Amino acid sequence: MLPNTGKLAGCTVFITGASRGIGKAIALKAAKDGANIVIAAKTAQAHPKLPGTIYTAAEEIKAAGGKALPCIVDVRDEEQISSAVEKAVEKFGGIDILVNNASAISLTNTLETPTKKVDLMMNVNTRGTYLTSKACIPYLKKSKVAHILNLSPPLNLNPLWFKQHCAYTIAKYGMSMCVLGMAEEFKGEIAVNALWPRTAIHTAAMDMLGGSGVESQCRKVDIMADAAYCIFKKPKSFTGNFIIDENILKEEGIKNFDVYAITPGHPLLPDFFLDEQPAMVTKKADSYGAVPELKEEKTQPPPKARSGAVEETFRIVKDSLSDDIVKATQAVYQFELSGEDGGTWFLDLKSKGGNIGYGEPSDQADVVMSMSTDDFVKMFSGKLKPTMAFMSGKLKIKGNMALAIKLEKLMNQMNSKL
């Protein structure tokens, strides 16, 4: 991992969403230099399912060698942002670095995204980033080491990244467009850049999206903290860049990336918005039967599902059903399968003992999954991760995403039997 150099000693770093995850990791990295950290986040009281508050984060920052100012901030609230900025300036004398980390996510298509979720993502991601930057900029302009760092992706206009989750993409790209505009607007005064991970990072959000076992396909938050630290060390002239964590660390001489892996040697899940995957990710993903999202398939096409493979898969699923599984799941799934042995199938995990069958379910499905028969068999046999299938466009989901994630647990139980 990247060693600290003391470069940020005495600097004041304002970080949104710093009570946990990547935001807290960046805070702790800076704290090791003796930086002043403003923890601008909503969590003042412990969440029943998520670890950490602004106050527990403050204690960790102090233990790491930094000074901490916990501030209750919902980035949708302009008054809370302004108040936190004023407190930071009063306590530490100014602001040197701003990290716009707070973000909201919903990986749902247009018709399945409630207006409330659209507003949340737009107001947290785009508007929150813009307003926090606006509030900090007058003080950043006075700093000799001024940086704004948005945790947002490169502006990739490939339609793939819009069709599955249009609202989320627009909201994240709004953060990236702040980089594009502000880097030019404040050139010479403030370095404005974006940072994005090459692979999935293990956070509470990733656990929610990927379900049980996804952590083995992720890297630790430390890789993003180290990459951010590299950026903070650069001069103001380093601006307007869309940086990938792995790339900048390679430039710093880091060669062993297994130290960042949750499970060293395990194939990693590529993150959103990146068309090209490094050879390491592609090779490891292929060895597990997965296909990165836009890998060009110049090799032989995947073999078709053997005759009756879908029926056999459902038979094994049915034999494995139990009242406990039904009780834990409580959902009806409908599968729209294309290709050989295709058609409409259902998996009823609401009725006593569970049930499967060909055709539409008698009750309305909670989740409708559309994919090829080949990918269906691969998913239930563990050769294709549902998260990877969804990200690559191989799997389309309509309905309740939380219930869709529950199905992955059942798939994991099938792996040893298929």
From Swiss-Prot:
The gene is HSDL2. NADP(+) binds at residues 17-23, 42, 74, 172. Keywords: Acetylation, Hydroxylation, Mitochondrion, NADP, Oxidoreductase, Peroxisome. It comes from Bos taurus (Bovine). The modification N6-acetyllysine is found at residue 116. One of its GO terms (biological process) is cholesterol homeostasis. The modification N6-(2-hydroxyisobutyryl)lysine is found at residue 42. Belongs to the short-chain dehydrogenases/reductases (SDR) family. It is found in: Peroxisome; Mitochondrion. It is an enzyme of class 1 (oxidoreductase). This is Hydroxysteroid dehydrogenase-like protein 2. It comes from the Eukaryota. CDD domains: HSDL2_SDR_c. The active site is at 168 (proton acceptor). Its EC number is 1.-.-.-. GO terms for molecular function: oxidoreductase activity. InterPro entries: HSDL2 (IPR051935), NAD(P)-bd_dom_sf (IPR036291), SCP2_sterol-bd_dom (IPR003033), SCP2_sterol-bd_dom_sf (IPR036527), SDR_fam (IPR002347).
